[in-house]
Amino acid sequence: PDEGSRERALDNYNLTLLPIDELYNQPKHSFEVIALWHVLEHVHDLSAYMNAFKSLLKVNGRLIIAVPNHCSYDAQFYKNYWAAYDLPRHLYHFSPSSMDKLCALNNMKVLQYKPMWFDSFYVSLLSEKYKNAGFFGIVRAFFIGCISNFKALKNPKRASSIIYEIKMLDAAL
């Protein structure tokens, strides 16, 4: 986070957040879990980050990545109004197949796909706001969120946002 955000975290919550450069200064194989909650879609150098994660994870460590899924029902419904496209802040847009490919390129494998159930409602509400849909939009957002989640019940790869549990393949160690 930027300096102002780090100061607010310290002042308001007594949390010390480090500049992103510190990621590259951590000892190798020092983390059992690295978690990114709606972060990866914002990074400028995806390859450098993936390499850093590989070097920081311990043997059998896990990388947990949560990102929006542009192949979800709500993304298909809202099309250009889908709030999780969030341009220009989202530099990347992921789907289960693109995450699988990213992992394969980095000698990693997705172990699990888990839906983020509430994201479908939040993203649908924002999408309706972008459409200036008014009160009816709030009602429609609820139903679109429900439909999106129903589809994710059958297939987690259809969720509005997905939590990926990722491990390195042995050859990467």
Model-derived regions: residue spans:
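A SAM-dependent methyltransferase catalytic signature shared across enzymes that methylate proteins
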Residues: 96-114, 140-143
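Short hydrophobic/aromatic-enriched beta-strand-loop microsegments
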Residues: 17-19, 84-85, 113
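Short secondary-structure boundary/capping segments
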Residues: 7, 83, 154-155
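Conserved SAM-binding loop
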Residues: 1-78, 93-105, 161-173
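A C-terminal cap/extension of S-adenosyl-L-methionine-dependent methyltransferases
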Residues: 112-173
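Short glycine/proline- and charge-enriched loop/turn segments
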Residues: 78-87, 125-133
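Conserved glycine-rich, hydrophobic/aromatic-active-site segments
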Residues: 90
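Residue-level signal for beta-strand positions within conserved beta-sheet cores that form or flank
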Residues: 13, 87, 109
